[in-house]
Amino acid sequence: MAELRPSVAPGPAAPPASGPSAPPAFASLFPPGLHAIYGECRRLYPDQPNPLQVTAIVKYWLGGPDPLDYVSMYRNMGSPSANIPEHWHYISFGLSDLYGDNRVHEFTGTDGPSGFGFELTFRLKRETGESAPPTWPAELMQGLARYVFQSENTFCSGDHVSWHSPLDNSESRIQHMLLTEDPQMQPVRTPFGVVTFLQIVGVCTEELHSAQQWNGQGILELLRTVPIAGGPWLITDMRRGETIFEIDPHLQERVDKGIETDGSNLSGVSAKCAWDDLSRPPEDEEDSRSICLGTQPRRLSGKDTEQIRETLRRGLEINSKPVLPPINSQRQNGLTHDRAPSRKDSLGSDSSTAIIPHELIRTRQLESVHLKFNQESGALIPLCLRGRLLHGRHFTYKSITGDMAITFVSTGVEGAFATEEHPYAAHGPWLQILLTEEFVEKMLEDLEDLTSPEEFKLPKEYSWPEKKLKVSILPDVVFDSPLH
């Protein structure tokens, strides 16, 4: 629960400037992380020392539900001559380490990221006659922050977020988000590490799909060229009724050419998915991955879970060559989730050594597998095949209901434990499937109707007996079962 109020001390927008005129005890009274971010806000808005802000009534570190302590809201006059309209500028406080005393984030030093390493911003076009900023963007930012805190997945520029609902709960076509660097907020170095500022950009469904099929950065560049769709500063207009492709049909050609030339930069998604080892007898429940009702999958230990997460994170990192690194016990920063080139899955900023479970060291070769996806995840299979594997890359589906994962790899990917001789291989609940270019082309032909999901009914099954591979597209309820 949050409240709207003008910011006054000790909120993040009220302290005096640091320097000779600052009170001697100020540094000890005002949290240094807050002070550093406020300094950047004050640089940008020197005439708005006390902006309106949405404040968490019960702070997250006191058991409240909202991870962001504050969201400050500034009035930005834009630049009419540069096609930048007047707008509201929202800035979060809480994804980075504001306090440095481990109440929320573990302090890991001054050289790395502060907390999760970023704060969110959002630019909303100001409507004529609007005297105060709408507060719904603050709740949107809280929702994204909850996702980050709960999943430990971070965001990076070019990432996209599938929201499937108007951002302001209206009838708007703006129902999804891309993320980019804020055009005005500069990274700041705090006593607890570095903080960058990632701006939320509202987009239509068609624009989200293009970002998935190509890459987020490419679509962001197109949005910058269309003033009504964002312009140079990527300002969200919730009243925009047309996609950039309806405004300028030639932009679709640029996307198509980009996909053909570059492939897709989307290397993985969080998804409703599962897999079964069909070469094992059904009564062997120890390693079953079945999601059928009545089957209880084996629960992973905490160490197993962390090891798989780390391996997935490392496997999703973007390298100059497509590489899936071997399982390693060393934790380090990296990236995953519905994302972009440098995927976002920061699963820990500290370095610690974990015991590698025996099951994860041992690779199991499988003779026959059954892949299961919900409709939304299944619709991305052609993207995985055409935009990733045909370009010598890999693509991972990470289950949102557990630690299970499915990684498709091409023959050009190094470090994969699936090989042409044994194309289906598993480390615990992580399955890798190696597909040759010839088989990818065959699958694309057979899966053509996935690009028009409204034309088929669930459940839908595809099978390649000669390859001992089966793919099922299933209703969401199958994955939502508490027994899964």
Swiss-Prot record:
Residues 1-21, 279-360 are annotated as: Disordered. The modification Phosphothreonine is found at T353. The modification N6-acetyllysine is found at K303. GO terms for cellular component: cilium; cytoplasm; cytosol; GLI-SUFU complex; nucleoplasm; nucleus. This is Suppressor of fused homolog. Gene3D superfamilies: Sufu, C-terminal domain (3.30.1360.230). Negative regulator in the hedgehog/smoothened signaling pathway. Down-regulates GLI1-mediated transactivation of target genes. Part of a corepressor complex that acts on DNA-bound GLI1. May also act by linking GLI1 to BTRC and thereby targeting GLI1 to degradation by the proteasome. Sequesters GLI1, GLI2 and GLI3 in the cytoplasm, this effect is overcome by binding of STK36 to both SUFU and a GLI protein. Negative regulator of beta-catenin signaling. Regulates the formation of either the repressor form (GLI3R) or the activator form (GLI3A) of the full-length form of GLI3 (GLI3FL). InterPro entries: SUFU-like_domain, SUFU_C, SUFU_C_sf, SUFU_N, Suppressor_of_fused, Suppressor_of_fused_euk. There is a cross-link at K321 (Glycyl lysine isopeptide (Lys-Gly) (interchain with G-Cter in SUMO2)). The keyword Transferase does not apply. The gene is Sufu. Belongs to the SUFU family. PANTHER family: SUPPRESSOR OF FUSED, SUPPRESSOR OF FUSED HOMOLOG. The keyword Ubl conjugation applies.
